[in-house]
């Protein structure tokens, strides 16, 4: 399974400079060594002081004293930094880079492991942290990303795949990036097998009911102002699950409040990261 580590490692200082200095194969090997060393270090710390290790990442199965803080506020050319002022920022796993939404998903998957183990899975824009969970549990999947290294280069709006191709389709924070999210939902429904499950999440602004999206291409500055990020084409509202229902799915929310505090299932790092996922069944 190929993944785009850029998704989950943008918070690491100097990572871009390292990419320029070393060839890809060496970077990949070095990355794995560093990850193993970090994982071993945190496991030793957790064993030495179990009572102080109050945080847990189900993606990499490691406990910590605290999670790491992102650098979102330092990137005003990409993020609306004002949307990170009132929310908790120490929410990133220092090993795999997971955010609350990933740890919620991994916890949910843990409770449905039998289903996943026997399912064909298509993962759009796969995150390193969730791939770690799948691999650790012996679950294979097909990855897809039109821009980064992946098994397939598919457009979620028009995959070209046969009808009813997969049992499970995952797309975390993808729908806010595509030109036509309704078309993407129709396509996912088409390629999902009967009784299959589409798991998705997207930014949800608590001040919006349904949707705020661009009607024509906006500048990066305007996207940052309205949608929180320079490559977002919309932000969804708190009743956006309506769009999933309209696409034909039977929708069940996966809420962070239903999961242990040790995984830190909080709102954040942005105020529109409500960290509500949706399990959408094709009935």
Specify the residue positions occupied by each region the protein language model found.
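Conserved N-terminal segment of class I S-adenosyl-L-methionine
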Residues: 5-164, 255, 261-279, 283
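S-adenosyl-L-methionine-dependent methyltransferase catalytic module, highlighting the catalytic core
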Residues: 45-55, 59, 179-188, 193, ...
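Activation segment
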Residues: 160-163, 178-182
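Hydrophobic beta-strand segment of the Class I
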Residues: 169-170
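Short catalytic micro-motifs in class I SAM-dependent methyltransferases
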Residues: 173-177
